[in-house]
Curated annotation (Swiss-Prot):
A lipid is attached at residue 169 (GPI-anchor amidated serine). InterPro entries: At5g19230-like. This is Uncharacterized GPI-anchored protein At5g19240. The keyword Cell membrane applies. Belongs to the UPF0277 family. It comes from Arabidopsis thaliana. Glycans are attached at residues 45, 73, 102, 135. Residues 170-199 form a propeptide.
Length: 199
């Protein structure tokens, strides 16, 4: 009997979240999960996702924020690209990773928790959303975050478009640093010209 790809992903996620807690470090778990994502994409003839450091930063920040929230069987969600992901303090989390909404609006943030007392958590709804989006060729990169207790998992999917690249925005950098630098340079030139006028 053939096993469906959805069941394969569901099984792998269940095993991963059930077994990794006492054995794997967060980094090992994130790397393993990333490998599972790419094996799945290869099985449906899609290119591998590339690791995106900024998406990983954001996933880690979201996980840190979720870490103290209670986890139930129904906890978890997926953002809709182009909308506010509904994560408290989201603008602050973006700023910590030197990102802004212009470079994240086409991406997707998936979050799920697996209660510690469940040996095989029910991840079917998360697996359905994850599988649907892993099948989407517009997603080209990812970042994964897992909390230190192994309860929360956040996956950030990125695109290769300006609106979903999760790249450190040059406009953002110029917006703050460039404005200050330009203002200081303008004041310097103005003061230099003022001094030469009075000499």
């Amino acid at each position: 009997m053939a096993i469906s790809k959805l069941h394969l992903v569901l099984f792998l996620l269940s095993v991963f979240l059930s077994l990794h807690r006492p054995v794997l470090s967060n980094t090992d778990g994130e790397n393993l999960l990333f490998t599972v994502f790419n094996q799945y994409r290869e099985s449906v003839n899609l290119t591998n996702l590339k690791k995106n450091k900024n998406a990983e930063c954001l996933a880690d920040e979201v996980v840190d924020q979720l870490q103290n929230q209670p986890c139930t069987n129904t906890t978890g969600s997926a953002s809709v690209p182009g909308t506010d992901p509904g994560i408290p303090n989201f603008p602050n989390l973006l700023a910590k990773c030197r990102l802004n909404t212009n470079v994240t609006r086409d991406g997707l943030i998936l979050q799920v928790c697996a209660p510690k007392h469940h040996s095989t958590p029910d991840l079917s709804s998360f697996a359905n959303v994850l599988t649907k989006n892993l099948n989407d060729s517009k997603f080209t990169g990812a970042g994964v975050g897992i909390d230190s207790d192994g309860i929360w998992l956040v996956t950030v999917l990125t695109t290769n478009t300006p609106g979903g690249s999760y790249s450190n925005s040059g406009a953002f950098a110029f917006g703050v640093n460039g404005l200050v630098s330009s203002s200081l340079m303008f004041l310097h030139v103005l003061s230099h010209n003022s001094l030469s006028l009075f000499s």
